[in-house]
């Protein structure tokens, strides 16, 4: 999985830097961007909503390394190809699945509106169990892309 690599010595998570350095790599120069979530923990992550006149996207700063991202990407593609409704990583202009900026990895997916799972709601629990069963069933033959982190279990 190829990456776009940019290195700067300033705050990579500022909206200005996201708009100036990250969005153009996805041909989103004229988009607006807003921060939705930020967690400043050991596994720092952030979520941005990117909007154009016709589409909305989710730009995520992920906390894992390239090999783990490759495993996650492998799993997402496997689930998608087995008819599970998962977001797909949108490639950059150079067909990369992520962008590396200030040693941070960013991915872009379509924006998906939805409700947070309410574990007190029997309908939500039933749907979650059905989906988990489908994931379990199609994952039996899963194999990750070469070069990704090997996970067992």
Regions found by a protein language model. Give the residues of each.
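Generic hydrophobic, aliphatic-rich segments that mediate packing or membrane embedding
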Residues: 71-75, 85, 104-105, 124, ...
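Solvent-exposed, flexible loop/coil residues
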Residues: 30, 40-42, 102, 121, ...
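Short amphipathic alpha-helical patches
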Residues: 46, 99-103, 132
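Conserved structural core of kinase catalytic domains
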Residues: 93-127
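Conserved NTP-binding catalytic cores of kinases and kinase-like/nucleotidyltransferase enzymes
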Residues: 1-91
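Mid-sequence acidic-hydrophobic segments that form the walls
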Residues: 82, 92, 108-115, 131-142
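A cross-family kinase active-site recognition segment
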Residues: 122-153
